Amino acid sequence: MSDSGHSQPNVFIPGRNRRRRWMDQGPPGHLNLSEPGREKDPMLRDRDQDRWEGNEEGYGYTIQKTPIILAKPTSDRTKAATPAAPPPMEKPIVLMKAREDGKPAAPAEGATAPPPTAVAKVEKEGQRPTQPVYQIQNRGMGAAASASGNVDPVVGQAKLLPPQKMKHSIKLVDEYMNWCDSAIEFLLDQTDVLVVGILGLQGTGKSTLMSLLSANSPDDDQRSYVFRMQSQEVRERAGNQTSGIDFFISQERIIFLDTQPILSPAILDHLINNDRKLPPEYNLPHTYVEMQSLQIAAFLFTVCHVVIVVQDWFTDFNLYRFLQTAEMLKPSTPSPSHESSGSSGSDEGIEYYPHVVFVQNKAKREDYCPRTLKQMHTVIDKLMLHSHLRYKGTLSMLDCNIFPGLPYDFIESEVNLFLIPTMESDVDETISRAGTSGIPLFSLLPAYKGHPSFHSLISRLRSQIMSMSRPQLSHTILTEKNWFHYAARIWDGVKKSSALSEYSRLLG
């Protein structure tokens, strides 16, 4: 210190320096109280003294302060890291269960939704989760499902249902030869389908046979058959029951097409006696009836895998002549892809031909004689010798064990022929007289029929038809719905066919 009482620069005063160092630390609120005091810690005291002694430039005292880091408490940091909750929905959507007996009604639309805890409690008690329920079904099945009550009580939608079962046949072509679209409601988008059609003269049992092959049993009531049979009144006036083409699809996804009788005298009589106007391209009623029959036959030869030809006596040569004419007039169809893929371009004209099965209905006992059976096969083979229809090699009565004593090569030229007896009850009348005294026991045995039972023969015919091959009807694989649209185009093409028009002109 000078004589004037002022301190000189660069003069070290221990007491003063220590006092000034602790006075310049800043406000007391920012001190780090967790650290030990600098006065008591010898290491901190020596470091601060070195810093003070090294700063001798200038006229003021410069003190380097220890940096202090300011941080929020842990609880505040946790709250800041939590994201903000999304804004609540303006109007919550509540899925309510349908009201049942003994339970209060559901709240109104504007009522407050129950808390989440209540919903979780209900789900824990066994209620199904409110997830969307999807339905794979056809057009028109949704209304049937809602009408039958198969509705999910949680979401109000129809459950997953099996294909709709048909109880009776519907019209595919009406009596005026117009196409009907109602059958598509029963079809699915699957390709494993078999189409079976039938042709025959009037009163040969076409509808009965198709009902037994599709969904009915001989023991069922004939009034419940899927294809309506000829009633007693219609039979007495020699009329026909089926008009146009009837459609039915079984649970095995097999489509059955029942047709009106070909070359029917009842239809001709109806045209003549009722003064029904003929289309302008036909001049005579019998020409119109024959062309109707040819249109139906040509249509079946194009859209069916199997065509059954029924006759109740052996045999009508006009029937075979009619089949050959329909084969000639059938519309051309593309060959299946598995046949045309490896062939040359010259084979593009190969047409599709279905399997043809000849069914001798109402067969008698003598028709099952091996010699008679062999003659039937020989006659049919010679009549169909030049036909392209697949009339042989796909069905055999010898393979059904109907004639156990005959060898498989007994019939040299075996065709697709099957004999069906008259449908009668298998219970013999003599069984009802079992309690009558004085009757020998051997008389209680059933009478000799010469063939298996009607139930057995129908079952064997059905199994052989179901096991037939299913070639492609067109160049692409068709689903059930694709087949329906394909058949509609074929029917329209048959009605507008130039070949059929030219043939009708030649008939006069």
From Swiss-Prot:
The keyword DNA repair does not apply. Residues 36-54 have a biased composition (Basic and acidic residues). InterPro entries: P-loop_NTPase, SMG9. Residues 1-10 have a biased composition (Polar residues). The keyword tRNA-binding does not apply. Residues 1-60 are annotated as: Disordered. Keywords: Nonsense-mediated mRNA decay. GO terms for biological process: nuclear-transcribed mRNA catabolic process, nonsense-mediated decay. Involved in nonsense-mediated decay (NMD) of mRNAs containing premature stop codons. Is recruited by release factors to stalled ribosomes together with smg1 and smg8 (forming the SMG1C protein kinase complex) and, in the SMG1C complex, is required for the efficient association between smg1 and smg8. Component of the SMG1C complex composed of smg1, smg8 and smg9. Belongs to the SMG9 family. This is Nonsense-mediated mRNA decay factor SMG9. It comes from Xenopus tropicalis (Western clawed frog).
